[in-house]
């Protein structure tokens, strides 16, 4: 562990990045914030550096548009907790190059992840399914079940953990931001449970 920790260096200024092969951005799930960070990364890293965003739902094309190298911008969605969860969604933007994709998929294998190439859609693969799963779980709470009961049934069904445990690990603020963003386009007639809000 000491050897691994010695390889990690914290910085507070993008200009301190040096000349990395890849930068994986990990800030909160808000488009304005990501579009503020990516031009800075673009300005201080060599043109060959891959700029990856660890977004769980946001449009990689919009993030890439904030740079001068959209062919080097890609999504790398690590699921929480990243040291346990094997899935790594590799999100191809409209202009992401084949070489960028190949490099990130190779990195996924080196990290022991199950890399899955996905396109642009709200929630990609994992969170697209998780959205419906948690929606139904919230309805169960409204009908009288407890979070522990719902999680236990899901666990007994064969999942690694239930939706409420996932929310606790990933951060309730993350799912709250996603719900707020999706509220703008949610059909009026779609049943919504405000219980998590």
Which residue stretches match the model-derived regions?
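N-terminal glycine-rich phosphate-binding loop for ADP-containing cofactors
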Residues: 1-197
């Amino acid at each position: 562990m000491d050897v691994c920790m010695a390889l990690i260096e914290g910085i507070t200024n993008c200009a301190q990045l040096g000349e990395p092969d890849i930068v994986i951005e990990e800030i909160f799930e808000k488009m304005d914030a990501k579009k503020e960070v990516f031009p800075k990364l673009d300005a201080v890293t060599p043109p060959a550096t891959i700029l990856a965003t660890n977004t769980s739902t946001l449009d990689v094309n919009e993030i890439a548009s904030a740079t001068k190298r959209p062919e080097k911008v890609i999504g790398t969605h690590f699921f929480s907790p990243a040291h346990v969860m094997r899935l790594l969604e590799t999100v191809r933007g409209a202009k992401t190059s084949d070489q960028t994709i190949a490099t990130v998929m190779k990195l996924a294998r080196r990290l022991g992840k199950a890399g899955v190439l996905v396109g642009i859609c709200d929630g990609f693969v994992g969170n697209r399914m998780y959205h419906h799963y948690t929606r139904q779980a919230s309805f169960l709470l409204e009908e009288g079940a407890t979070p522990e009961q719902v999680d236990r049934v899901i666990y007994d069904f064969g999942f690694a953990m239930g939706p409420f445990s996932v929310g606790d690990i990933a951060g309730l603020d993350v799912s709250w931001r996603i719900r707020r963003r999706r509220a703008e386009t949610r059909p009026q007639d779609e049943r919504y449970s405000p219980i998590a809000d």
